[in-house]
Amino acid sequence: IYDRLVGSEMCIRDSHHAAGERDNNIGWWDEFIGHDKTIDTNRFFVVSVNNLGSCFGSSGPLSKDKNGKRFNNNFPQLEVIDWVETQKMLADKLGIKKWHLVIGGSLGGMQSLQWAVSYPKMVKKVGILAAAAKTSSQNIALNEVEREVIRKDNDFYDGKYLEFNKSPVKGLKAARMLGHITYCLLYTSD
């Protein structure tokens, strides 16, 4: 987001869908982004990006390679630093020298933190929401259980489910339920 008043930038991180008044689909940030809201679009231009490999429209495991076959499990493993590097490329392409704010929740918060570490001179402020600098061993274990539940779904087919016109809906549903339990535990544990 370009600061219309002082010439610095701002960036929002989460899914790329920040929405807005002209969008019928409610976005994660609707309560915060807009005219006279916390992130005031009278003052700031908002840049909301899609992560490489995400399900929101970039190249990812379901994209096809040069031979016309889906990458599936052959898509490269990505890390937070990879997403920040692609965002930096976008900033360079847009001519953005400094963000006023890099903000995000959960994985977006981890990216905000990575921006501060990798490019501290490009970031005036960082907003880190519901994110940690390091993933706990419990969280790593629970994430692996979620992945295993999806892999064990009979319709997963080693990640090639679309070739069989299937979708691992049961595994995804169970993994999502487990994920929601972990969110609740964060608020109920001491």
Language model features: what each stretch is:
Residues 1-14, 187-190:
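Single conserved hydrophobic/aromatic residue that forms the stacking wall/gate
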Residues 8, 13-65:
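N-terminal cap/lid subdomain of alpha/beta-hydrolase-fold enzymes
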Residues 28-34, 110, 163-165:
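Short alpha-helical segments and helix-capping/turn motifs at coil-helix boundaries
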Residues 66-68, 123:
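A short alpha->loop->secondary-structure connector
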Residues 72-81:
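Catalytic nucleophile-loop/oxyanion-hole region of alpha/beta-hydrolase
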Residues 81-100:
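Conserved acidic catalytic loop of the alpha/beta-hydrolase fold
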Residues 100-101, 106-128, 134-135:
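Conserved hydrolase catalytic core segment
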Residues 128-189:
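Alpha/beta-hydrolase-fold enzymes
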